[in-house]
A protein has these predicted regions:
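Conserved sequence/active-site signature of Rossmann-fold short-chain dehydrogenase/reductase
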Residues: 60, 122, 156-158, 196
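N-terminal Rossmann NAD(P)H-binding glycine-rich loop of SDR-like oxidoreductase domains
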Residues: 4-26
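A conserved pocket-lining segment of Rossmann-fold NAD(P)-dependent short-chain dehydrogenase/reductase
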Residues: 169-191, 195, 199-203, 207-210, ...
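NAD(P)H-binding glycine-rich loop region in Rossmannoid oxidoreductase-like domains
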Residues: 46-101, 105, 120-124
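Conserved Rossmann-fold NAD(P)-dependent oxidoreductase catalytic core, especially the SDR/UDP-sugar
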Residues: 81, 89-144, 149-151
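N-terminal Rossmann-fold cofactor-binding loop
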Residues: 31-36, 58-59
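Mid/C-terminal beta-alpha module of Rossmann-like enzyme folds, strongest
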Residues: 202-265, 279-309
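Flexible, glycine-rich beta-alpha linker
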Residues: 126-128, 149-168, 187, 222
């Protein structure tokens, strides 16, 4: 099997992709930023001795990548920053710049195979720093001349996720109302993190996937309002979901950013939530040959996390 260089192996998606790669018989070289993260990975995957190696580095440090990728057959790039408090500069540095650094390292090392985790619906839009930075990262991969494959998921759900835990935090607030930006009708296609990991392993082993992008979404669409209601049900909370004007929520979020108060959602994310984030409802089954898991009734992990606090 192949020797895979993996970024983001200690993150939410990576914590599912890494064991999936090991289970498929691959050797994994995981990029980590410090020795503490390396030790956590080694302990977590102690049952696979010899199959996991860690190397220190950072995607924003081009020099650290040059030797780190040596000896690998393929690269799986998962690292992405979802938001920042720096006007988009950090998003650009990680999502666009970090991807460019890794592509350059692959080219220099002669590594042809490159699987990149993009995002569904990202375009270069004025004021949408996350979407623009991810779009520029994807453009770099497409223009690389490598045997690339891009996976573009909608919202990803699963234990340790970002978005659904943020919604859960809002639902946990002891108030009868949970605000959603705009009219609450923006549509999403939540996809289970286990299905994302399955897709990574599948395309990695399929030469025909080179030069292609795949949209990853669940088997049905959910509005923002429906997602919030589903989270409330999972937590056993009775809440009224109240649409609120985006400018009002952006004002509150903007004030929190100005004083560095950790408001759950950055203003950039609020703008992004105004757009639909969906692909073909049968896209995964048609393109990858498996039926993705439906999110409905499966958010119990949010309650379990609360019970540990």
């Amino acid at each position: 099997m192949a020797r895979i260089f993996l970024t983001g192996g200690s993150g939410f998606v990576g914590s599912h992709v890494l064991p999936a790669l090991l289970a498929a018989g691959h050797q994994v070289v995981a990029l980590v930023r410090n020795e503490k993260a390396a030790e956590r990975l080694r302990v977590r995957h102690a049952a696979a001795p010899g199959a996991l190696e860690t190397r220190l580095g950072d995607v924003v440090d081009a020099a650290s990548l040059r030797g780190a990728v040596d000896g690998c057959d393929a690269i799986v790039h998962l690292v992405a920053l979802p938001r920042d408090w720096n006007g988009g500069a950090d998003l650009e540095r990680v999502n666009a710049g970090g991807t460019a650094n890794l592509v350059a390292a692959a080219q220099a090392a002669g590594i042809r195979r490159f699987v990149h985790l993009g995002a569904l619906g990202v375009l270069e839009r004025d004021g949408l720093h996350y979407a623009s930075s991810k779009a520029r990262g994807e453009a770099t991969v497409r223009a690389s001349g490598l045997d690339w494959t891009i996976l573009k998921p909608s919202l990803i759900w699963g234990e340790r996720d970002g978005f659904f835990n943020i919604v859960a935090a809002l639902v946990r607030v002891p108030a009868p109302i949970v605000p959603v930006p705009g009219d609450g009708k923006s549509r999403f296609q939540p996809v289970w993190v286990g299905d994302v990991a399955r897709a990574v392993v599948q395309v990695l082993g399929d030469p025909k996937s080179a030069g292609r992008s795949y949209e990853l979404g669940g088997p049905r669409y959910w509005t923002h309002r429906e997602i919030t209601e589903e989270v409330a049900r999972a937590l056993g909370k009775r809440r009224l979901v109240l649409p609120m004007p985006v400018p009002l929520i952006r004002l509150v979020a903007g004030l929190s950013e100005a004083v560095r108060f950790p408001f759950p959602v950055a203003t950039d994310q609020l703008r992004q939530l105004a757009f639909d984030n969906i692909g073909a409802v049968d896209g995964v089954e048609r393109e990858l040959g498996f039926v993705p898991v439906d999110m409905g009734g499966r958010l119990g992990y949010l309650r379990r996390k609360i019970s540990k606090q």
